[in-house]
Amino acid sequence: MKLIILIVLSILISIVISGSVQSKITTTRGISNVYSKNDINNIKQFISSKYNGNTKLYGESLKDTFYGVGVLTRIGETNIEATKDICKQTKEQLKQNKFTDIELVFNGVTILSELKCLQGESSSSLGNEQQLQDLLKNKLENGSLLEKTQAINIYFTLSSAKAIDSKTVSIIDPLLIQAVNSMVSLMDEDGTFKSVSTDDEGNLQNTAAAYFALARLSHRLKSNEVDKLVAKVVNKVDTVLASADETTDSLYFNDLSTTSSLLHGLLSLASVNDKVADVISNKQINQISEYLLRQKNVESLSDAYHLIVALKRCQKNSISQPISLALVKSIYSPSGLNDIRVRVTDIFDQPIEASIVINKVVSSKNPRSTPILSGKEMKFQSSDNSFVADLSNENLKLGSYNFEFKVQPVDTDSYKSITNIQIITITGAVTVNDMKLSYAPKSDQLGSPKTTNEVQFGQKLPLIEIPSNNIARIFFRIASEAQPYQAQQVGIRFYSPAREAVVPATYSADAYSYTFTNKDACKILGCQSGNYQLDLIIGDQSITPLQWNFGEINLKFNQSTIPTNRYPEQLPISHNFRVAEKRPPQSISSLFTLLVLSPIAIFVIGLLFVGTNLGRFPTGMGFIYTIGFLGCISATGLLIVNYWLHSTMDVTLKNLALLMIPLVFFGHKSMSYYSNLSSSNIKKD
């Protein structure tokens, strides 16, 4: 018996262990997009366009400059425009402020630190040292949560740059542990942080700021007391994560700035407390990355800053760093199957060392069918940092196939393995020839070689910027076995993370084309400036459907962006009711009413002429039966009158059905009584 119990326990333990291990090694599909060099160049240009030569700042204030400088330093821009002027203007504003506005001081000190303008400086060069001490001391002791975190960040930034004197250090250091206690006391039951103790509830922005500040304090102070308080905060992280908005492939908190700040704070906490890694999963990091990559087209310095900060934290963190697998080409001819290529990169499109295996290949039409091939290892090509597989001998016919790639990174501490499915189309039925993208100020200049870009079938054009005053045309031919082919459906798809539109191509003289102006593009894309991928979509019942990503264009619109709306305003709904049938004349209606009421009238008139004889009214049980019968008949009459006045047929029939039970009973008893009475009278006679 003991042996059986031990066997059962061992089986249960093995199931639990295998389940937990399985949950740890579960792979994801990776991210579907990356922040490429083109995206970095675009955001550089956006930041540069916000520089104000008069104020020597980015945007309108020191806060905007904090955002602009933060973006440029994080994307590796070393030669920032007018660095000396920005530092000079920042120092002047700090001196004018006299250390009274904690937010302005935080922005200014951070700008100087990131531009390396604090090296060899002291805090006295920014203003009165005593005023700085008073500001930090006051905010650490009596400030709101955000003011405490800003004071902590100012202090650590100046300390790192050795730009603060020993007297200030001796005053502020003892207040830091007190600040930790004060901040943790502001944590609500749901894990969020209040601004002050009198607030009814906390919010996520406060929570993000508290996470980052507590992580810095834990790292700097090396105190067991602080670590215990941080652990108390970490125990509520799962509750905070549960408040996220989640879709199939993305996860976010309210908006971009909140998502970025909270991610930054959570990953900072993870660097000082290992339990955070048990709460945030690899899948959630990938979902947040997907959300961030959809926010590429920023429209403010604030959005640009929060986007880059969050992307950088995704790229480098102690939990999981997302990776992407992308096809170099998605369309192959049967003769080109010896060169199937993919690239594996991080979120900033940087190559990653890995090994790749094609797990299986199945038909896209029947994904559950038996794999055509499996376990095919791909070889690394250092020339372009891609992985190659030769499938020329695998008997792949024309059609679309689901390729399942298993990516195992070399650096398993930083990256997790992914399983990614990509669709590769093998087509020989139709080909696209003479694909050209041209643009010019006038339509009769569209054929100029200088502004015409050609691309071979299956390849992709580099990014092309189309001026807003130009006309653009996409021209191509579709052929089958070297003969012109007119497909049933041919469209051009414009898409970006924010917008998507498909327009039909026009067929004429054995060729397809689509011509558009900046105004046309603005109308179909909601005037959303940015980069748009171009896909050619061909559909026909007699060929394999084809979707080819042949290029990328940059469109800039002068009009303001039209916001998207899932529920656009529609025209009011008007109902056409059936015309009522013509009613009969009033005389006919009156005659019908008289006919219905005539039996009652005859009964009343008859009583007046004949009279009533109550002497023969029954006694005993006959009396009860007769009264019940007459009562039921009266109730039936009243029910009919009620129906005429305001009741409905459904209600009337239900009540009539109930009334028929006592009516039949009393009627039967009454008739039986009178029948027996008549029989007895006949016998007497």
Swiss-Prot record:
Glycosylation site residues: 142, 558
Signal peptide: 1-18
The protein's annotated pathway: Protein modification; protein glycosylation
Membrane topology recorded in Swiss-Prot or TrEMBL: Multi-pass membrane protein
Keywords linked to the UniProt accession: Endoplasmic reticulum, Glycoprotein, Membrane, Signal, Transmembrane, Transmembrane helix
Chief location of this protein within or outside the cell: endoplasmic reticulum
One Gene Ontology biological process: protein N-linked glycosylation
Transmembrane segments: 591-611, 621-641, 647-667
Segments in the Cytoplasmic topological domain: 612-620, 668-685
Topology, Lumenal side: 19-590, 642-646
Cellular localisation: Endoplasmic reticulum membrane
Gene Ontology annotations for the cellular component aspect, listed alphabetically: oligosaccharyltransferase complex
Subunit note: Component of the oligosaccharyltransferase (OST) complex.
Recorded family membership: Belongs to the SWP1 family.
Described function: Subunit of the oligosaccharyl transferase (OST) complex that catalyzes the initial transfer of a defined glycan (Glc(3)Man(9)GlcNAc(2) in eukaryotes) from the lipid carrier dolichol-pyrophosphate to an asparagine residue within an Asn-X-Ser/Thr consensus motif in nascent polypeptide chains, the first step in protein N-glycosylation. N-glycosylation occurs cotranslationally and the complex associates with the Sec61 complex at the channel-forming translocon complex that mediates protein translocation across the endoplasmic reticulum (ER). All subunits are required for a maximal enzyme activity.
Protein name: Dolichyl-diphosphooligosaccharide--protein glycosyltransferase subunit swp1
